[in-house]
């Protein structure tokens, strides 16, 4: 290839020409694909992604207007042969550019308002909740102001748009009208946005405790939280409740305020730089146009990838939405017949051990693998082992839809002879019990850790008796008890207190099942029996889970012993010699 051929490939004919540099089209297409993927994700999974309503509308409108700006630029900036089309291109570029910058300013304003927002009132306080403000004002500002500016400019003189003379090779505005109609408003918008950024940064430096965006509880959740605060362990009667921000609200956005601030500032910089290099690419000479076209392509791809990575790839809730749409990433317990199920402290199989999407764990943050220390419904042995298993607010559907069937199965199994069926107990693998506990699919980088945790839990939860025999703990335990009127389905659908308090309850925990909407009581009857939870015994010679030495069995067991040294375990006495 000769030197002349190389120049022909890398550069374009003298302006005016029909096409721009090839890198402009390629990089614009990549950016459009990234923005399109982000928009589709946030539209289809808007209820599953933890982002505020204002933030979602601002992001979607920014992506739409940015895509419109660069699409019109790449497709029509050099269409000078058609005057009417050239004027339409100039009007569209004028409107979309101002609207995109205004939506970035709206994002900066929302971040500042959230940082400077007053602390949320405690549950049960007499203060009225914050009124929900409509989003129409944002659309009137971000869409109405550019529309008015473009309308006034075009109504004054339509020739302000298009080509000013024959020597101009691009479709834009005349120089003098553009100073007051575009460059002045754009500079003012950028200045106000930077002021919002600076004020937000100062507030975050003054108040480092303000890290995440919170949302208020609904009225129903606040009513449920008021009686819950009076039944917490470790709180003396008459003590005023503490106002915990995370207890009164849930996380509204997975990203912190600092991450949102950095993302908005970097987005404004990338958009401004991309627009500037694009303008220089079509207005400069024969050699500089290639340099600025490459710079435009680099910043254009960076803008699209940054939006996709920050708003989608760096969010665990978005990853879970993506994997849920993939049919090959279904539930591993159903696709792999030889895989061992994850067992809880009672030996029951669980679909997922992590908190669900709408779980009542306000301190649970997506993307972090450390479970919160409180506010979660945990059984005693799960609290000791550090495993958190939260139930979904949709738990009452299990009791409502499958109550009749579970009561029939319970009545059928109560009269069966006791036998050692662990771990092939039909209650452990009942699909009706696990349907309401089914959680969202974990992201791909948690799969290996979850598999390893499942192996360890499967090996740990093999029941054993006090003498070390793995057969006596299940076969010698009572199958049912008349301790309470609740049905057996409450063990799978509701969080109840352990009838064998071998482990002290976690501080701040709540054993009331009313938080999840479970019925407080059922009509007593002979069919409403409650299955006793299976317990695990610890070997002698070491401290038990309640802090007592295993050498003194009488002190550590929840039931007393008779004179012969046998253990009384409840309504029926299982004679187990110590």
Swiss-Prot record:
GO molecular function: G protein-coupled receptor activity
UniProt tissue specificity: Predominantly expressed in CNS.
Transmembrane feature ranges: 23-43, 57-77, 88-108, 138-158, 179-199, 263-283, 290-310
Biological processes per GO annotation: cell surface receptor signaling pathway
UniProt key word Transmembrane helix: yes
Region (Disordered): 216-236, 463-486, 537-578
Family as reported in the entry's similarity comment: Belongs to the G-protein coupled receptor 2 family. Adhesion G-protein coupled receptor (ADGR) subfamily.
The protein's name in its UniProt record: Adhesion G protein-coupled receptor A1
């Amino acid at each position: 290839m000769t030197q002349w051929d190389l120049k022909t490939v890398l550069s374009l004919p003298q302006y005016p020409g029909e096409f721009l540099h090839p890198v402009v089209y390629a990089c614009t297409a990549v950016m459009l694909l990234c923005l399109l993927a982000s928009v589709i994700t946030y539209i289809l999974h808007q209820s599953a992604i933890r982002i505020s309503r204002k933030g979602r509308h601002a992001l979607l409108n920014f992506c739409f207007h940015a895509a419109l700006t660069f699409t019109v630029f790449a497709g029509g900036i050099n269409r000078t042969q058609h005057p009417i089309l050239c004027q339409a291109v100039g009007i569209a570029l004028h409107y979309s550019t101002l609207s995109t910058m205004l939506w970035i300013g709206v994002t900066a304003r929302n971040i500042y308002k959230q940082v400077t927002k007053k602390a949320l009132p405690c549950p049960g306080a007499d203060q009225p909740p914050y009124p929900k403000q409509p989003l129409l004002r944002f659309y009137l500002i971000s869409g109405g102001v550019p529309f008015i500016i473009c309308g006034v400019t075009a109504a004054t003189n339509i020739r302000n748009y298009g080509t000013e003379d024959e020597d101009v090779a691009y479709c834009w505005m005349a120089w003098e009208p553009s100073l007051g109609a575009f460059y002045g408003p754009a500079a003012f918008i950028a200045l106000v946005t930077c002021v919002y950024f600076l004020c937000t940064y100062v507030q975050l430096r003054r108040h480092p405790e303000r890290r995440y965006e919170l949302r208020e509880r609904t009225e129903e959740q606040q009513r449920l939280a008021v009686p819950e605060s009076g039944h917490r362990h470790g709180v003396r009667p008459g003590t005023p409740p503490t106002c915990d921000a995370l207890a009164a609200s849930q996380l509204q956005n997975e990203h912190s305020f600092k991450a949102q601030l950095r993302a908005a500032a970097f987005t404004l910089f990338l958009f401004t730089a991309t627009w500037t290099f694009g303008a220089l690419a079509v207005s400069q000479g024969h050699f500089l146009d290639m340099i600025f076209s490459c710079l435009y392509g680099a910043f254009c791809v960076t803008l699209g990838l940054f939006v996709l990575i920050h708003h989608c790839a760096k969010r665990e809730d978005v990853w879970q939405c993506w994997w849920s749409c993939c049919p090959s990433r279904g539930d591993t317990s159903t696709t792999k017949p030889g895989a061992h199920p994850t067992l809880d402290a009672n030996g029951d199989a669980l679909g997922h051990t992590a908190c669900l999407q709408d779980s009542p764990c306000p301190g649970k943050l997506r993307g972090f693998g450390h479970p919160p220390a409180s506010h979660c419904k945990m059984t005693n042995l799960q609290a000791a082992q550090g495993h958190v298993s939260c139930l979904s607010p949709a738990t009452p559907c299990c009791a409502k839809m499958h109550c009749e069937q579970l009561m029939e199965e319970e009545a059928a199994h109560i009269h069966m002879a006791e036998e050692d069926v662990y771990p092939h107990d039909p209650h452990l693998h009942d699909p009706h019990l696990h349907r309401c506990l089914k959680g969202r699919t974990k992201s791909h980088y948690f799969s290996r850790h979850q598999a390893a945790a499942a192996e360890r839990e499967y090996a740990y939860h093999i029941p054993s008796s006090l003498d070390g025999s793995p057969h006596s703990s299940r076969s010698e335990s009572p199958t049912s008890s008349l301790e309470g009127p609740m049905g057996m389905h409450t063990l799978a659908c509701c969080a109840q207190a352990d009838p064998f308090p071998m482990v002290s309850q976690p501080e701040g925990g709540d054993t009331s099942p009313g938080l999840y909407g479970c019925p407080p009581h059922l009509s007593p009857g002979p069919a409403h029996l409650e299955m006793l939870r299976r317990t695990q015994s610890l070997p002698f010679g070491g401290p038990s889970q309640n802090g007592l030495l295993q050498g003194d069995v009488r002190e550590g067991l929840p039931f007393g012993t008779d004179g012969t040294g046998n253990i009384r375990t409840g309504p029926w006495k299982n004679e187990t010699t110590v």
